[in-house]
Swiss-Prot record:
Keywords: Endonuclease, Hydrolase, Nuclease, Ribonucleoprotein, Ribosomal protein
SUPFAM superfamilies found in the cross-reference section: Ribosomal protein S16
One BP annotation, GO: translation
Stated name of the protein: Small ribosomal subunit protein bS16
């Protein structure tokens, strides 16, 4: 099953997440099909905290991909801000 979820990157105590489309059987930070955005939970006010390619996310959902709870909350937040 294809899923859209967060992959953790960054340093210790400084997380940075990439929003990726991947097979649900792959490891959290393992192989992915496509990167569709990023999320920086500790971004300063002058840095961009979240960027999502909503068109590609809609494409993958149309193909049957499921969305993780956290990514769904990020999508809702981005749409509200736009």
């Amino acid at each position: 099953m294809v899923t859209i979820r967060l992959a953790r990157h960054g340093a210790k105590k400084r997380p940075f997440y990439q929003v990726v489309v991947t097979d649900s059987r792959n490891a959290r930070n393992g192989r992915f099909i496509e990167r569709v955005g990023f999320f920086n939970p500790i971004a300063s006010e002058k840095e961009e905290g979240t960027r999502l390619d909503l068109d590609r996310i809609a494409h993958w959902v149309g193909q049957g991909a499921t969305i993780s709870d956290r990514v769904a909350a990020l999508i809702k937040e981005v749409k509200k801000a736009a």
